[in-house]
UniProtKB/Swiss-Prot annotation:
Belongs to the ATPase alpha/beta chains family. Disulfide bonds: none annotated. Its EC number is 7.1.2.2. One of its GO terms (molecular function) is ADP binding. InterPro entries: ATP_synth_asu-like_sf, ATP_synth_asu_C, ATP_synth_asu_C_sf, ATP_synth_F1_a_nt-bd_dom, ATP_synth_F1_asu, ATPase_a/bsu_AS, ATPase_F1/V1/A1_a/bsu_N, ATPase_F1/V1/A1_a/bsu_N_sf. The lineage of its organism: Bacteria, Pseudomonadati, Pseudomonadota, Gammaproteobacteria, Vibrionales. Keywords: ATP synthesis, ATP-binding, Cell inner membrane, Cell membrane, CF(1), Hydrogen ion transport, Ion transport, Membrane, Nucleotide-binding, Translocase, Transport. This is ATP synthase subunit alpha. The record marks S373 as: Required for activity. It comes from Aliivibrio salmonicida (strain LFI1238). One of its GO terms (cellular component) is plasma membrane.
Amino acid sequence: MQLNSTEISDLIKQRIEKFNVASEARNEGTIVSVSDGIIRIHGLADVMQGEMIELPGGHYALALNLERDSVGAVVMGPYADLQEGMKVTGTGRILEVPVGPEMLGRVVNTLGEPIDGKGPIDAKLTSPVEVIAPGVIDRKSVDQPLQTGYKSVDSMIPIGRGQRELIIGDRQTGKTAMAIDAIINQKNSGIFAIYVAIGQKASTIANVVRKLEEHGALANTIVVVASASESAALQYLAPYAGCAMGEYFRDRGEDALIVYDDLSKQAVAYRQISLLLKRPPGREAFPGDVFYLHSRLLERAARVSVAYVEKFTNGEVKGKTGSLTALPIIETQAGDVSAFVPTNVISITDGQIFLQTELFTAGVRPAVDPGISVSRVGGAAQTKIIKKLSGGIRTALAQYRELAAFAQFSSDLDEATKKQLDHGEKVTELMKQKQYAPMSVFDQALVIFTAEKGYLNDVELKKLADFEEALLSYARGQFADLAKEIDSSGAWNKEIEDQFVKLVEDFKATQTW
């Protein structure tokens, strides 16, 4: 048989052309140990800090420890089925969560997946959970108020848009209640809200969601949940995920409010992860970077400039500043604010609202201690009318506390002292407020006006609550235009003062309570 070399070469060429090898470059490693949600991986040479690692079964782990011959990663999900020898793959991606207006009104987990049974979320965009905070040049000073609806807070410890105001106190002092009321008060203000629940019971979170829905505030709120039954990794990441969702609004010239409830539990989750990763422990067994854990989170709350918003949106949004206001919550043990995490967060934030157990049990709710509560930047943002009227409130309360302690030892007090005690007692009573009943600017201004101008001198202490309720009802009915004007402008002048005088005097002359 004669072999034709040309035919053979053509045949070989055809075979080579048809031969197809599908190949993909993958960064693959092997699990060498699994314990308590922490896996050690050998062979992932090019992995990044914070990279998502794909595990068998569709779950992911987060690379946190990059060591010479292995990678320590924390599993974001169930880890019972993971075994030594299993293959894992580096994704080359940092953890991202869905963001955008589609998230509003929904309850999601740390990864942005819906857990409220209302179907999938069609979010168009995602954002990394870890983002560098805006620089000094990109920021604008805080000068717009964020009304919490609490008389005691808005008058003595005002909060501005873009501020970080810590709510601190022992367990069962009304910290969550204050934050939820602040969210409810934003329902008609155009401010979006994000509530991040960290390490709480699922029943407690369900109750919060129900209350937000009842008061019409859930529609402009995103609830991010990492409950007590979730892994430490998800509890540690939840605040960053919520912050990324809030930054979407900030960077597009909108205003947003984020509540972290609470950062003590996040610090404990991070301590657990760090100890399991064998990082050296420091004070109270926390790792050395626990300050950075909170500072990099809270620095992302800011008021950003017009130029920043224009640059971020490529000129689509013009002439608007955006803001993200943070209300972190810290739980203290027996009132000890000098513990490690509380002192860290106090030094990072722009002020703190201190809630006292003694005041709470005495029926003063919200249990705000005006002596050690402070707002370092909110004064510039306070509504003009509240600023003008509330100057004497803090002084009256401070003098009352001082005199009340002195009066316990002395029976014969002069008239001036008795007057001061009576006034302080009434101001304390006036600062009390029911839960889920945030007050408008007009309502707050009117109540403070009656105290400051001496209209309460002839009102009995036990009838003060009835007096306040009747006065506000009368004012909303008879002076509706004035109420509307003050709620929208917050202005204060001689004309408004005269109308306030007329309102209160007419009420006292014609009404009963």
